[in-house]
Swiss-Prot record:
One GO cellular component term noted in the UniProt record for this chain: cytoplasm
Expressed in which tissues: Found in the carapace.
Record PROSITE patterns: LIPOCALIN
Keywords: Disulfide bond, Pigment, Secreted, Transport
PANTHER family to which the protein is assigned, alphabetical: APOLIPOPROTEIN D
Family affiliation: Belongs to the calycin superfamily. Lipocalin family.
Top-rank taxon, per record: Eukaryota
Disulphide bridges: C12-C119, C46-C170
Classification via Gene3D superfamilies: 2.40.128.20
Subunit comment: Oligomer; Can form dimers (beta-crustacyanin); or complexes of 16 subunits (alpha-crustacyanin). There are five types of subunits: A1, A2, A3, C1 and C2.
Annotated protein name in UniProt: Crustacyanin-A2 subunit
Main localization of the protein described in the UniProt heading: secreted
One GO BP annotation of this record: lipid metabolic process
Length: 174
């Protein structure tokens, strides 16, 4: 076994976090439109998530769904929640069979887009993932240009992102 392909030399970008992050406004349906590919995410197209705010957990119960490369429809349930050590927009992902990872909302307007960064540095290597979320499944338009500028400004190269396919056969049931 070698080093996984998503582990690369370097350190994580030091990204900004959304000021005055409002968990309740962030809740609801989001579509992934562009991603830095993630070996831990088995779905590769029609990716959508439902973020259900939970007052008891002070965070989100998340269901993400979509199709894997074998055209199987998969649903994954996990939690995303803030911690006392960081601002509210710097949360943790708690998912089955995955170590706890950061979930940093760099910027969102809550209505159209969200820029999310997740990266862990170990020694001089990083495991870097990032996501463009949209309230609609469109993969082009002004929101994409806006999110590209946000990531580039924060030291995350938007050229590393790939579009997520959202075609007519997509089913959104999460």
């Amino acid at each position: 076994d070698g080093i996984p392909s998503f582990v690369t030399a370097g350190k994580c970008a030091s990204v900004a976090n959304q000021d005055n992050f409002d968990l309740r406004r962030y809740a609801g349906r989001w579509y992934q439109t562009h991603i830095i590919e993630n070996a831990y995410q088995p779905v590769t197209r029609c990716i959508h998530s439902n973020y259900e705010y939970s007052t008891n957990d002070y965070g989100f119960k998340v269901t993400t769904a979509g199709f894997n490369p074998n055209d199987e429809y998969l649903k994954i349930d996990f939690k995303v929640y803030p911690t006392k050590e960081f601002p509210a927009a710097h949360m943790l992902i708690d998912a089955p069979s995955v170590f706890a990872a950061p979930y940093e909302v760099i910027e969102t307007d809550y209505e159209t887009y969200s820029c999310v960064y997740s990266c862990i540095t170990t020694d001089n290597y990083k495991s870097e993932f990032a996501f463009v979320f949209s309230r609609t499944p469109q993969t082009s338009g002004p929101a994409v240009e806006k999110t590209a500028a946000v990531f580039n400004k924060n030291g995350v190269e938007f050229s590393k992102f790939v579009p997520v396919s959202h075609t007519a056969e997509c089913v959104y049931r999460a």
